[in-house]
């Protein structure tokens, strides 16, 4: 005979689930309000100022967030989940040729971050371990998606795919760090940054294709220094 679960237990579990869902939704509302407040007034807002902008007391904020570090981490996580990752999925799924796709992936990352300068700087000014983990997790997700795309395209071309993961991490990590440096000190336009990063990434990908993705072929090839053109000479 099957064991009957007491009705009171079922009701309690249902209440717990509803309360948990309410807390998640309310927390997301507060994070969204924080992001809007930072967009309007800049990254130096205090918890008191954030609470006032959202229209709640600071006590309410601390009911959902341990401290400002916790709120900062939640802002980064929300931005990653609702904006960055969806934008990167769309870019990686674009039906484009190699060069155009390479530039599109880089463009989407740079412009997604550049579109949120104050929230980005608000997050990056925080040095908590939890924030660093969120950033590392987002990079890992994007790198794995890039690796899947590279592997598929290389397999279709009959190339060796053994290096797709380190290549993907190199591209994602390099673009992220270069974009962060540019956001901190933008000494060129976003288009120039995108094209410089595309120049390096595309040149690297061309080298990989020339070796068929094969480490053995790459090792066997001669690697002379490139001949530097005499630019400007008639």
Swiss-Prot record:
One of its GO terms (molecular function) is transcription cis-regulatory region binding. Coiled coil: none annotated. Keywords: DNA-binding, Transcription, Transcription regulation. InterPro entries: Homeodomain-like_sf, HTH-type_TetR-like_transc_reg, HTH_TetR, Tet_transcr_reg_TetR-rel_C_sf, TetR_C_32. Residues 24-83 form the HTH tetR-type domain. Pfam families: TetR_C_32, TetR_N. Residues 46-65 bind DNA. One of its GO terms (cellular component) is extracellular region. One of its GO terms (biological process) is regulation of DNA-templated transcription. SUPFAM superfamilies: Homeodomain-like (SSF46689), Tetracyclin repressor-like, C-terminal domain (SSF48498). Was identified as a high-confidence drug target. This is Uncharacterized HTH-type transcriptional regulator Rv0472c. It comes from Mycobacterium tuberculosis (strain ATCC 25618 / H37Rv).
């Amino acid at each position: 005979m099957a064991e009957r679960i007491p009705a009171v237990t079922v009701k309690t579990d249902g209440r717990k689930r509803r309360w948990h869902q309410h807390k998640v939704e309310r927390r997301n509302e507060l994070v969204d309000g924080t992001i809007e407040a930072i967009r309007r007034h800049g990254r130096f807002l205090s918890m008191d100022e954030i609470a006032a902008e959202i229209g709640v007391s600071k006590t309410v904020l601390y009911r959902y967030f341990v401290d400002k570090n916790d709120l900062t981490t939640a802002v980064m996580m929300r931005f990653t989940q609702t904006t960055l990752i969806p934008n990167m999925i769309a870019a990686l799924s674009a039906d484009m040729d190699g060069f155009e796709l390479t530039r599109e992936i880089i463009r989407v990352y740079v412009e997604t971050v550049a579109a949120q300068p104050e929230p980005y700087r608000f997050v990056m000014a925080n040095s908590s371990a939890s924030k660093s983990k969120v950033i590392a997790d987002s990079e890992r997700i994007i790198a794995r998606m890039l690796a899947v795309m590279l592997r598929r395209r290389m397999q279709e071309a009959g190339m060796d795919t053994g290096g797709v993961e380190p290549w993907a991490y190199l591209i994602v990590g390099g673009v992220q760090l270069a974009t962060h440096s540019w956001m901190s000190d933008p000494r060129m336009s976003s288009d120039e940054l995108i094209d410089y990063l595309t120049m390096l990434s595309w040149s690297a990908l061309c080298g990989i294709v020339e070796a068929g993705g094969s480490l053995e072929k790459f090792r066997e090839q001669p690697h002379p220094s490139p001949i530097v053109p005499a630019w400007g000479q008639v």
